[in-house]
Amino acid sequence: IYDFAILLALYTGLRIGELCALQWGEIFNGRIYVSKTMQRIRMNSGKTEVVVTPPKTDKSNRCVPIPSFLLPIVERFKMQSGYVIRQDNGNFVEPRLMQIKFSQRIKAYGIRQTHFHTLRHTFATRCIESGMDAKTLSEILGHSDVKTTLNKYVHSSFELKQTSIDKLPFVYAI
């Protein structure tokens, strides 16, 4: 289930808390309806507790398309109800545990350690590289401002720079 969670995050750009709070009733017609997030908060007693709350902003309430190639995989994991990412006993997987499982997975694959949120950045960068416009990407990510998407999430690569520069028309005589 953790590999499925990683794949889902990598191809939808969901935040870790949104993914952990996601229930099967919020996935239908090839779409994910994001309306809540899961987080661990510190209580007055000093202990922490996992809570499910509305997302950060109104823009975070959104509909995220699932790539067509991923739909058969989603169907393979689909259950009638409950959390999409759940433990064997049916309980939810909280963000802290998801991060631990993610770290274990990437270490096993020989990938340098990074945070689960990197999947969201990777998703954003690959979307722009594939030609998605910034406004559409910003809406998929649930950002209130396109500038947030471009300045914090999209990372230009040399290959993208080269491809972009090669699109310039040849107009000068040599």
Model-derived segments and their meaning:
Residues 21, 29, 151, 155, ...:
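Phosphate-coordinating loops and pocket residues in cytosolic domains that bind phosphorylated ligands
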Residues 20-21, 138:
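Short, surface-exposed helix/turn micro-motifs that flank interaction/cofactor sites
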Residues 21-76:
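Conserved tyrosine-mediated DNA breakage-rejoining catalytic core shared by Y-recombinases
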Residues 2-3, 12, 64, 79-92, ...:
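Short, basic (Lys/Arg/His-rich) helix/loop patches that form interaction surfaces
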Residues 1-16, 20, 60:
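Basic, Lys/Arg- and aromatic-enriched nucleic-acid-binding interface segment
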Residues 3-5, 34, 42-45, 74-75, ...:
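Extended hydrophobic-aromatic, low-complexity segments
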Residues 38, 71, 141-166:
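Catalytic-site neighborhood detector that most strongly recognizes the C-terminal catalytic loop/helix
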